[in-house]
Amino acid sequence: MYNDQPIFAPSEWKLTKQQEVLCLETRQIASSKFVERAVKYDLEASFPTENYKDLHESNLMGICIPKKYGGRDADLKTYMLAASEIGRYCGATALTFNMHVSSCLWTGYLADNLDMDDEKRNEHNNLRAMHYERILKKGSIYAQPFSEGNASAAGKSAFGTTALRTDKGWIINGKKIFASLSGHANYYGVLCTELFSENSPPSRANTMYVAIPSLQEGVRVEGEWDPLGMRGTVSRTLIFENVFIPFDEQLMPRGIY
């Protein structure tokens, strides 16, 4: 284990006790385990799967999951401080972990500060409990592929990836580029446009945020990924072709995102 000093000295940066503890935990696990594997991931352009197993065993996969669901309850600042320590030793893990944690922050800290009526709030709480259980108990990894090569991610147009509503769920069709964790995440947290019929015009007002199981029929990964310094993120192209998902794979309430 490296005996490196913390990036953010607790007394100088006036860290809270929670921030100090999480920074210590991430520094210890990254300096003792991640650093020795980092070169291999970059050389092979392979995903840091072993590091995620260590994060799960160290109770860090739920770093930003609310405490009442069994998580560590870190806010954005606390997570950023802790993740900085991971980045010192394995950039690929820090970058991809950010995608996973962002899903937890959106459904957790962000959602808790949005206005919802009681019905939507109860629905969201019930659904996110299921997603959080997957993460905490199974170590499930949630990716966050948004990019499509158009203006949608900037909020200038509707997402080209669509979710056709059916009686039992949605049928997803579309493509995401630069999709980090492709082929390695358990669930893809996808932004898409809900359609109520095949002839419905796409609208930004109908943006959906849903989880697509990576092993679901119709999901595939294409293309190469070989950029300098980011090979381990495995940000290839995701294709969704008539992929069915049930309603409980919703990550954020409809009309809220």
Regions found by a protein language model. Name each.
Residues 217-244:
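Flexible, small-/acidic-enriched active-site or ligand-binding loops
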